[in-house]
Amino acid sequence: GEQPEGNIVARLQKAFPEELADLSSDLVKIVFSSNIYSLYGKLKDDDGFLDVVEVLKEQHKEDKELHDLDRESVSQVFLFFDLDIHGLAQSIEQSCEQLDELLNFFDNETENGKLFFSYPMVEVVNICDQSNGLMSEDRKLFKICDCEGDGFKHFVNNLNRDSKTICRANCRDNWLIVCKANYEKAQWLMHLTSDELFSVLDQMQQNAIFQHQQVLIKNEGVVATLSAFPFFLLEYLGAGKIARMIDP
């Protein structure tokens, strides 16, 4: 999205200036301006997937910064997308197959790129409760059908208007609360039974999370609410550093 993802990345950079210094120094932001399934259609060919940077350069020919970008100079590629599985012409099963393909292909930021999903949408970063995280009954799961007509955005706006206990991801301490809530939620979703959260962080890979999400999507028509950005931090900084930051 043109605004939300860029704003959230900027908030992350402000909250973690030292930890994300390398990322901040030469970051190039590119907006795809459509959903993940449209990207799939542009990338997919008979031999697999095309290079995402070259596809985006072709799409944004008028962008001089992007036009002058040498692919060999790009050391890391991170992709942030909403699940956006509601209101599609294709079936849920076909959409899940495409997402699975994409996650298996975009699984390394220094090679093809690393893909991160927000479930169901980027605004999910704004629903964490100060005490109950993402496990309150009103936000633990969200119906796919209720995402229609900006339904999830309206839900988030109403929640932020009516609730006095939302933890806003606008500073370092709050980001760490939001991150921990997302990791605890993933632990619940993935049935990781260890009593020690930090011992299972390494298992919270995007493709593994999606395997559990698609069971909910196909069988119950819901997703477990999760933000992409805590898992980006986990990937970028590593489980050990994240654990020390959350529980110093």
Predicted feature descriptions by range:
Residues 6-29, 34-47, 56-248:
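C-terminal accessory helical subdomains adjacent to catalytic cores in phosphodiester-
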Residues 1-5:
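Short acidic, Gly/Ser-rich segments with clustered Asp/Glu that frequently serve as metal-coordination loops
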